[in-house]
Amino acid sequence: MKSILLTLMVFSGLIVFADDKNEASQSLNPILIDVRTYAEWNDGHIETAIHIPLEKISNTIEGVIKDKDQVIYLYCRSGNRSGQAEIALKSIGYVNAKNIGGIKEVSTNLLLKILKD
């Protein structure tokens, strides 16, 4: 049941009604961010993710993602740090930041591979 809810939550963020095609296309392409440490990232990360460690996310995000309406999916090892990242991003205006859990859960539910460097 938990995986069904996560899948529904993730894909519900993909449905957008917008007049501006650019705005719609941005929202249709969520950005996946891994907020774990560099060592954890190097041990394996989701294939489409970008890496911004939790301790740097508040100071780095605006240089990476300008549009504060962009859908952002956050993950870590268990979902704890990605939950903290969601709170931090929402506090600076990223209204569509979503904690989607831990790396194994995300990989399984989104059918994405874990790559090792």
For each feature predicted by the language model, list its residue ranges.
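Rhodanese-like catalytic fold shared by cysteine-dependent sulfurtransferases
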Residues: 2-4, 16-30, 38-70, 80-117
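Phosphate-rich cofactor/ligand-interacting catalytic cores and adjacent structured alpha/beta frameworks
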Residues: 34
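Short, surface-exposed ligand- or partner-binding patches at beta-edge/loop junctions that are enriched
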Residues: 75
